[in-house]
Amino acid sequence: MRMMIRILACLAFVLSGVSAGAQSFYVSPKADQAIAEKLLSELHAIKSGSPDVPTSGLMVEAAMKLMGTPYVAGTLDTDPVNEQLRIYLTKTDCILFVETCLDLALTVKEYKACPDFVQFAWKVASTRYRCDAPWGYGDRIHYTTEWIRRQDKVLKDITLELGGKVYDHPISFMSTHPDSYKQLGNARNIPRAALALQKITETEAELNRTPMTFIPKDKVAGIESRIKTGDIICFVSAIEGLDIAHVAIAYVKGGKVGFIHASQAAGKVIIDPKTIAEYVSSRSNLAGIKVVRPL
C-alpha cells in the first residue's frame, strides 16, 4: 500500500509539472541552461558525424568541454526544506560532474534530433531520483552504489571481471550520521526529516542485500591496462558505512591511465596529474576502486 501511494504521488507530480509548464519541475539558472544546450548541440553534431560513437566517447567529449568548471560542494542542498531538481553546469562536485557527463551523453543518444534542455532535465531527474521526478530528499539516490545498480541498462559494473572481489563493507553512513545532513537533522522532531531518514535507512538495508565489490588498492596497478577511456572510476571508501568517496572518468593517453574529475583540492574540473593507481594508493581513506563501463 505504501509503495502504491508513493507511485501515485510521483505520477501526480509528473503530471502537474507537465500541465503547469515545462520549467516547473527543475531549478536551473539561464547561464547553466545555455551551457547545457550548447553542449547538447555539440555532442549531437559529433553523433551525427559518427553515428556509432559510444556513450563513453560522448561522456569524455562533455568532460573536456567542462574542463575548469569550479568545484562547489553541496550544490543540491542549498534549500534543506524544499527538494527540487537542481541542474548546474557553472559549478559541480565529483558525482554531479560524472552524472552530468553521462546524462548529456544519454540524452544525445536517445534523440534523433538535437535535444533541448527540458529533455536533458528529464534525463537528469530519471537518474538522480527513484521516481523520474523529485518530491522528497529521501527519494534522491544518495549512494553511488545505488546509482550504478539503477543504471544497469546503460552501465555495467566490470569490477569482478577485472579481478575484483567482494568487499565486506555494509552501507550505513547516512542513517548513522543524520546530523551531518541538514535534511536529516533533528529527525525526532521534524516529520519531514523523519520520513527521509526512514527511506534512506530502508535503502541502505536493500543495498546491503547484495555484496559490494572492489579492486583492492594494491591490485589497481595490475589491472590499469584494462581500463578504457570513458570508464567510470569509483574510489571505494575505507570509512565505515560509506560506499564511495570519489568518482571520476577514466582518461587514457600515451599509455598513462589517468582520469578527469571535479577535484576539491584543485577547486575545479581537471585531468589529474596522477594515474588511477597512484591516486588511490596515496590516500588512506580509500580501500580501492570499482570500474563501471558505459554500454
Where would I find each of the regions flagged by the language model?
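Mature, folded catalytic cores of secreted/periplasmic enzymes
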Residues: 38-48, 57, 112, 214-218, ...
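Sec/Tat signal peptide C-region and signal peptidase I cleavage site
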Residues: 18-22
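C-terminal soluble interaction/assembly domains
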Residues: 220, 224-295
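Cationic-aromatic interfacial patches
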Residues: 24-99, 106
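Acidic/His-rich structured neighborhood in mature extracellular/periplasmic domains
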Residues: 69-208, 252, 261-264
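Mixed-charge, Lys/Arg-rich low-complexity intrinsically disordered regions
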Residues: 196-226
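Bacterial N-terminal signal peptides
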Residues: 8-17
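Bacterial N-terminal signal peptides that target proteins for export
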Residues: 1-8
